[in-house]
Amino acid sequence: MSLARMLLKASLFAAIALLPIASVANAQSATEIQLSYKDKKFDPAEVTAPADTPIVIKLRNLDAKAMEFESKTLKVEKVVAGSSDATINVRAQKPGRYEFFDEYNEKVARVALVVK
């Protein structure tokens, strides 16, 4: 086996071996936001996150009924069963204000994500 071929194999092996480490580093750099939902209200009603950073929303539905967490601008939609928790992953965003709502109670159940 030639030296060039051995170096190529070693480089590929090293790159593949480092993939899990890169994934963990990316997961750790996400901003985590805690939200709760009860009586058609989100708490808190407004949250902030840094720009250009992935966001992980940890949502706890304290109501007995299901709700649908949705944002049309961010193309995020998730049904959350009553009395349960959900994790919603949001891609990194540019600065701005993004609205989320419960589709079943859209007019009153709203939360704002402010990205700075």
Predicted feature residues:
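C-terminal segment of classical bacterial N-terminal signal peptides
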Residues: 16-25
